[in-house]
Structure formats: structure tokens, C-alpha cells
Amino acid sequence: MKLTSREMEKLMIVVAADLARRRKERGLKLNYPEAVAMITYEVLEGARDGKTVAQLMQYGATILTKEDVMEGVAEMIPDIQIEATFPDGTKLVTVHDPIR
């Protein structure tokens, strides 16, 4: 199977987000890459499901709380910018203060 670099990046996000979800379910606190992957994955899937940019900007800030991540991780992520594919094209979704 041949994948473009963009497709490989999306696949890596899915794998990292799945690992993060499993660790969270086991009660483990997430580190920086896991937290970013989980939020990114949920926003990408929301775009695929037809949600708007505004909806995803709000939704992205509800996925994880400070209790879900290791100490200091929330402060390391002031915002996340995700290039998501919507039915009408690719758009940039910025989630401000994603972990509250």
C-alpha cells in the first residue's frame, strides 16, 4: 500500500490517539503527544462527520481536562491547529486552551 506523507501523518494520529484512549481508559494520565493526538483525532473525525469549524473549536476544548493529563501538560498546549477535511474543502481549525 502506498500512502502520501499526509495520509501517513493521519494514520499516525489515529494510532497515537487509540493508544492514548486505551491508556486513559486504564486510568493513566496522558503525556503531551498523547493529549495532542487525542484532540486532533476527535477534531478530524468531527470534520468528517459534518460538524462546522465553530462547533469543532468548541468541541476540541471539551475532550480532555487537566485531570486527564500529566502535570504541566495543559500549560504546554495553549492551542492546537488542525488542518481538517470538510465536505466543502480543507480548513484550519484552531482550538484555544484545549485542556481546561
Curated annotation (Swiss-Prot):
SUPFAM superfamilies: Urease, gamma-subunit. Its main location: cytoplasm. InterPro entries: Urease_gamma, Urease_gamma/gamma-beta_su, Urease_gamma_sf, Urease_subunit. Its EC number is 3.5.1.5. Keywords: Cytoplasm, Hydrolase. GO terms for biological process: urea catabolic process. It holds the Pfam family Urease_gamma. It is an enzyme of class 3 (hydrolase). Pathway: Nitrogen metabolism; urea degradation; CO(2) and NH(3) from urea (urease route): step 1/1. GO terms for molecular function: nickel cation binding; urease activity. It catalyses: urea + 2 H2O + H(+) = hydrogencarbonate + 2 NH4(+). GO terms for cellular component: cytoplasm. It is found in: Cytoplasm. Belongs to the urease gamma subunit family. Heterotrimer of UreA (gamma), UreB (beta) and UreC (alpha) subunits. Three heterotrimers associate to form the active enzyme. This is Urease subunit gamma. It comes from Bacillus sp. (strain TB-90).
